[in-house]
Structures are given as C-alpha cells and as structure tokens.
Amino acid sequence: MWSDPIADMLTRIRNANVVFKEYVDVPASNIKKAICEILKKEGFIHDYKYIEDGKQGILRIHMKYKGQRRDRERVIKGIVRVSKPGRRLYVSKDEIPKVKNGIGVAILTTSKGVVTDKEARVLGVGGEVIAYIW
C-alpha cells in the first residue's frame, strides 16, 4: 500500500520521461484523472486513456516529446510533488506561486476542483498545492 498515490503517479511519469517511454500505466482515481487532464491541456503529455480492469482501473498516460527518434527532447523538464501527506501546503488566492517565472505550472486542488495556478488566480480561489511542473 502506498502512503501517497499522487507522488507515485508523478514519479512514474518522471521515470518514463527520463527513458523516453511511449506510455506509462498508473492505477486510476478521480484526482489522477483531473491531474492528467491538466497535463494534457497544458501540453505536457500527448493524451491519456482510462482502461477498465475490473478493479479500480488503469490510466494509460501517453508521453509527449519534441523531435524525432534520434533527436528527441523532453517536454517535461521537471515535476515535483509539493504538498505531501506529512506536510500539507495550503495557499490563499494572493499567495499562489509562479513556477519558473510563469514558464511552469502549479497544480492546485481547490473548492472549484483541480486547477492550474493561472485558473486559480482567475477564479480567485486558493487551495492545496499538489505539484509543480515545468
């Protein structure tokens, strides 16, 4: 049993990215689907698909790279889990961080759902900072 399923998902994505895997499978949950939707919308992954397996299901995340086979370049430069089970990080609407001076994205879980830092500023809500990705 994992103590932090979101950190496990981010680590699987990071490891697949390092070795240029085509896709990576992670156990599914609603919050993981929401995070994948943000990663897809922001252009960090190509696509994701929910696969029913009779239990909780699997999310197959298709990775995204720039260039062709020999000259591939990673789209995801870094991905970091911020709020952890042992140390939660909550921010107000005025304290929402910018990642790499606006180049990266902070993923937050708010009362309005899982959103990016930009969306949270527009909505005027704060919440728990899940991860930074750039």
UniProtKB/Swiss-Prot annotation:
It comes from Pseudothermotoga lettingae (strain ATCC BAA-301 / DSM 14385 / NBRC 107922 / TMO). GO terms for biological process: translation. One of the primary rRNA binding proteins, it binds directly to 16S rRNA central domain where it helps coordinate assembly of the platform of the 30S subunit. Keywords: Ribonucleoprotein, Ribosomal protein, RNA-binding, rRNA-binding. It holds the Pfam family Ribosomal_S8. Part of the 30S ribosomal subunit. Contacts proteins S5 and S12. This is Small ribosomal subunit protein uS8. SUPFAM superfamilies: Ribosomal protein S8 (SSF56047). Belongs to the universal ribosomal protein uS8 family. It comes from the Bacteria. NCBIfam families: PRK00136.1. One of its GO terms (molecular function) is structural constituent of ribosome. GO terms for cellular component: ribonucleoprotein complex; ribosome.
